[in-house]
Design a protein with these regions (language model features):
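Acyl-donor binding region in acyl/amide transferases
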Residues: 69-71, 77, 90-171, 285-353
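Active-site/acyl-donor-binding loops of N-acyltransferases
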Residues: 2-25, 89, 152-185, 322-398
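A conserved beta-strand-loop-helix scaffold within acyl/acetyltransferase catalytic domains
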Residues: 21-102, 144-174, 181-303, 396-397
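Short intrinsically disordered coil segments
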Residues: 128-130, 190-197, 365-373
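Short C-terminal domain-edge/linker segments immediately following a structured domain
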Residues: 54, 104-105, 114-119, 170-176, ...
């Protein structure tokens, strides 16, 4: 295991040729990794992944994933952490052979490993060598990753060079916001349809008539915990609470939220009506992209469109400030509301790689098959709901 505790020790790019030390860790050993080194790796990773931030992962292992069999491969150079591959054996996809699945749950929505940008080639070469020679699991599945991200571009090239097998499954488009050269006005005219823009402006006018509206951004240690609790309450009061999918529906999930969405990682943006939040959006970031995995709004104001208003105000704020370079909707399915406001997208999928091509192909087929079945079930339920709604109600004698 890596035991060096120097707070800001990061090997230079010139150390690429230094011997890479690899350790296979269980959950307890993962939790014991030097915090400063894990944090430094997260900030300097080739492809940003705040879902594998130390606070997210350790909160997960202590709450929603407590008892789950989790492992990791750590890569170090000169005592400094330069790579971290987090995985689990459990998966929603049954396979007839062992698979290292990227660590995932309802809240960890990106399986991209953390690889130091200055040591990426060496770490990837070492990782694939371990996979080929039996020093690591022989087949890996990385869920919900950006196919165009630098890590997977390098991985794919290295896999091809070694003759290993590569496949992708369950593709979808994720909304992604970047700045247009023409600024906010160009964004509004090119990204939003005329009807959408009219709806937004009508919504803003109606909200303004209802009271004083303002956008609030909170990320400091003093105020953030209170706004996290406000978000949990707001989310639970709506349809997610009724469906049992809100954070507060399960004590472990609520504890995860309070432990992981902390200052230094998380921020909360709120649409305030007369000082009270009626729509809230959670974001996390470790570099220059904000990932927004959760949004909630007060359903008593549903007709006023608070969610739409918040999205619009955040677009305005994005162009008015340069704190971040991009926003990732962090949704694991298409159809996210941000698609109406964001100008770009990422090509997302599950990446599968391994030594045996038949295993890789079979696992990709299983992933795609489960996704197809899931969509058919959802379509069937939607049709059933429509029929129940359309069915004539029986006369009731009075």
């Amino acid at each position: 295991m890596i035991t060096d505790t120097r707070p800001e020790t990061r090997p230079s790019a010139g150390d690429q040729s230094s011997a890479i030390v690899v350790a296979r860790l269980d959950a307890a050993q993962l939790a014991a990794l030097p915090a400063a080194q894990w944090d430094l790796l997260t900030r300097n990773s080739l492809t940003e992944n705040p879902f594998f931030d130390r606070r997210q992962v350790l909160a997960s292992l202590a709450t929603v994933d407590k008892g789950k069999k989790v492992g990791a491969l750590s890569f170090s150079v000169g005592g400094a952490l330069v790579g971290l591959f987090l995985f689990q054996s459990r998966s929603k996809i049954p396979a007839p052979f062992p698979v290292a699945n990227g660590l995932a749950n309802d809240y960890l929505l990106n399986g991209t490993p953390l690889i130091d940008r200055d040591h990426a080639d060496a770490v990837i070469e070492k990782f694939l060598d371990l996979v080929r020679t039996g020093g690591a699991p022989a087949i890996w599945a990385f869920d919900d990753v950006d196919l165009d991200a630098a890590v997977f571009q390098k991985l794919r090239a290295a896999v091809a060079a070694t003759g290993m097998a590569w496949a992708t499954a369950t593709p979808y488009q994720r909304a992604y916001l970047t700045r247009l050269d023409g600024g906010l006005e160009e964004h509004l005219t090119q990204v939003l349809s005329k009807n959408r823009l009219k709806d937004v402006r009508r919504t803003m006018r109606r909200l303004g008539e209802a009271g004083h509206i303002a956008l609030e951004h909170v990320e400091d240690e003093a105020r953030l915990p209170g706004r996290i609790d406000d978000f949990l309450t707001l989310e639970n009061a709506g349809w997610k609470g009724e469906m049992g999918t809100s954070f507060l529906s399960r004590p472990a999930d609520a504890e995860f939220a309070r432990c992981s969405y902390v200052a230094g990682l998380a921020a909360m943006d709120s649409l305030l009506l007369d000082g009270r939040p009626i729509a809230m959006k959670l974001s996390i970031r470790t570099q220059r992209t904000a990932f927004t995995p959760k949004i909630a709004y007060d359903e008593t104001y549903k007709k006023l469109g608070p969610g739409m208003a918040l999205e619009y105000m955040l677009i305005e704020d994005f162009y008015a400030n340069d704190t971040i370079d991009a926003v990732d909707a962090a949704a694991t399915a298409e159809g996210h509301s941000a698609l109406n406001f964001f100008n770009n997208h990422k090509s997302m999928a599950t990446v599968i790689l391994g030594c045996r091509s038949w295993q890789v192909r079979l696992l990709a087929w299983l992933h795609d098959g489960r996704e197809t079945l899931k969509k058919k079930v959802l379509e069937f339920r939607a049709r059933q709901a429509e029929r129940r709604h359309a069915a004539p109600k029986p006369d009731v004698e009075t």
